[in-house]
Amino acid sequence: MNVPVRRPLFHRRPESNLYRMFFWVVLILAGIWLIREVQRGEVKPLFIPTATPTRTFNSYTLEGEAQFTAGKLDAAIGAYQQALNLDPGNAQIWVNLSRIQTYSSALLVTDDARRTRLAEALQSAEKAVELAPDDSMAYAIRAFAKDWNANPTLIDDREVQRFLTEAEQDAVRSLQLDNTNTLALAFYAEILVDQQKWSQAQQNIEQALNRGEQLMDVYRVNAYVLESLGEYNLAIENYNKAISLAPNLTFLYLRVGANYRTLGFRSPNEDTQTQLWETSLEYFAKAANINEQLGVNDPGPYLSIARTYSQMGEYFAASRNVQKALQFEPANPDIYGQLGIVYFKSRNYEGSIPALKCAIEGCDEETSCQARFGSSCADAEETGLKITGMALSPNTVVYYYTYASVLAALSRPQQNYCSEAHQVFNQVQAQFGTDKDIAGIIAAGETICAGVAQGNPPSTSNATITPEGPMTETPVATGTPVP
């Protein structure tokens, strides 16, 4: 049977399309090219995250300057350290870092914290001089850092003299390299004050002022020179000029407040005295408000407020402000010591014992609650902290002899604390026995304990034998008011 070939009457015969084939060839070749380019990194895949721009050291430097101007000194230090991670050989960054580290030490409370920060500042200045041995500003900042390290409440007298001598040498070298360096001239004046060369200090700072440069550091040093001469009103005027140039640096407000408090302490007129103390409180409150606006948790302004209230005899307000300071640094032993002194002055002798114990010996969690809240942690519904005590030093000796004096005064034959009081008195005697006031306190305490041993308990009022502590106006070391 023959079947005829089907004719394409109703459908098209399949046939090749030249254009379609050309399109597919081009598409395949383009795909191969794209894959190779992606593998080589010339073409980036879709939907990958956008790369984050790498910051330069200049951006961190600008951030550091801005943070310092804003009063955020710790943030400024962090920014400059980030800049140095990118450019560790930049001497100018080391200079700026050292200056801020030095100033920031004024906001720290404990001896150890100040000592550590000042050592870091000096290390930064040393690095600046190493990188730029012919740079005037590097030597000026190293002189500044060494002068602030020469703090007799932090180091012994021999080290103080060594630092002051080296600081003067650096200041002289800075001016030899550039006699137009106004900051070097100002820092030299500050060094001369600490060397008790007041006439030379005045000459140097007047030269710096006559150059007409509007520098915060120059007005600050001029105020410091005037403070050392007892010219507290003029010192306030110059601190205010420094504040006008750097309105967010809270340590300047603390200096003004301290000078007003000193004027109040020395005023014979009761109304004037009260007015001066209130002005002092206003400046400390400004510092606290600036910190609050900046989000800076600094106990310093509240401790300064407490000192002023203590000077005014308003011990309840003083204790409230010390407790506010403890909210920022609840493990700071120095603040416990200051709280103990306030309790002591308000004749809350029993309450002063746990606070002073935490300051000098350290204490467990339960004792820290007793010190802060006057009750157990459970009753206060608070969590206690373990506190590390502070070593005996010129800044902490008041806590030691006050603690021992209270223990002696509260001793009774049936509840005798004199054994512990003897131990503390012996420590103080070994280091500060040549101080007549301290020697008198020790002798009085030992007399009380001798009476207790003989069955003659003291009157509680004998505890008032202790003289003024850290709430006093003028430390022996510097002759300038304490903030």
Predicted regions located by residue number:
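Short coil turns that delineate tetratricopeptide repeat
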Residues: P88, P133, N179, E213, ...
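Residue-level recognition of tetratricopeptide repeat
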Residues: E65, R99, Y103-A106, F144, ...
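Alpha-helical segment of the N-proximal tetratricopeptide repeat
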Residues: P53-L86, Y103-R114, F187, F265-R266
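Conserved structural position within tetratricopeptide repeats
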Residues: Q82-N85, Q123-E130, Q169-Q176, E206-N210, ...
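Start-of-helix register in tetratricopeptide repeats
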Residues: N58, Q92, M137, F144, ...
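Register position in tetratricopeptide repeats
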Residues: T69, Y103-S104, W148-N149, D194, ...
